[in-house]
Swiss-Prot record:
Keywords: Bacterial flagellum, Cell outer membrane, Lipoprotein, Membrane, Palmitate, Signal. Belongs to the FlgH family. It comes from Pseudomonas aeruginosa (strain UCBPP-PA14). It is a lipid-anchor. A lipid is attached at C19 (N-palmitoyl cysteine). Its main location: membrane. One of its GO terms (molecular function) is cytoskeletal motor activity. This is Flagellar L-ring protein. The keyword Lipoprotein applies.
Length: 231
């Protein structure tokens, strides 16, 4: 194997290695817990029953509605998609050309070796046919729960929530991340809400370790499955 081929293979392997999505990293600042912007004042022992800043509405249901409050999102995601396409292109062509006379004189002569008369004629025919059939299907399901914090309260009362959960297993780490918008009316009395009620949801389920590496195809498999493969 010459040096040029070795360099080419190394270049292809490096390029395909760069196409792999980098593994998720823990402690992403975007998903970090958001603390309340206005912390409660320190309690003053002045002998009074009621302290300023510690008031509580008697009819408050304790549902999350402020920055830093905690909400548990129940994951109930299920998607199923399928696609099928068929194509058939066919083209036939035939051309025939013959000369029987030239300036009023016949162009047909006797064949000196037998087998009929000779004439100036030509005939061409062609046929092309292309067929294609493709089918793709995908089904995903994600169930569980994740507890997040309220990062921002929009002017219309919508809550912007986000958070992550890491689980360390024997063979690696499992990650669940979610971010989106939640209506305060959709939050139950126990501060739970279904993921189907989260608007503009960004849900990530990934991991690192042996299981995550085993589910990734090798660099040669990625080359055969990439658009660079000419066949």
């Amino acid at each position: 194997m010459n040096r040029l081929m070795i360099v080419s293979l190394l270049g292809i392997a490096t390029a395909l290695g760069g196409c792999v999505s980098p593994p998720p990293k823990p402690n992403d600042p975007y998903y970090a817990p958001v603390l309340p912007r206005t912390p409660l004042p320190a309690a003053q022992n002045n002998g009074a029953i009621y302290q300023a800043g510690f008031e509580q509405n008697l009819y408050d249901d304790r549902k999350a509605f402020r920055v830093g409050d905690i909400i548990t999102i129940t994951l109930n995601e299920k998607t199923q998609a399928s696609k099928k396409a068929n194509s058939d292109i066919q083209k036939d062509s035939k051309t025939k050309m013959g000369l029987t006379s030239l300036f009023g004189s016949g162009m047909t002569t006797n064949n000196p070796i037998g087998g009929g008369d000779l004439s100036l004629s030509a005939e061409y025919g062609g046929s092309r046919d292309a067929k294609g059939d493709s089918q793709a299907g995908q089904s995903n399901s994600l169930t569980g729960s994740i507890t997040v914090t309220v990062a921002e309260v929009l002017p219309n009362g919508i809550l912007s929530v986000r958070g992550e959960k890491w689980m360390t297993l024997n063979t690696g780490n499992e990650l669940v991340r979610i971010a989106g918008l939640v209506r305060a009316d959709d939050i139950a009395t126990d501060n739970t809400v279904s993921s189907t009620r989260v608007a503009d949801a960004r849900i990530t389920y990934s991991g690192t370790g042996a299981f995550a590496d085993a589910s990734q195809p090798g660099w040669l498999d990625r080359f055969f499955l990439s658009p660079l493969w000419p066949f």
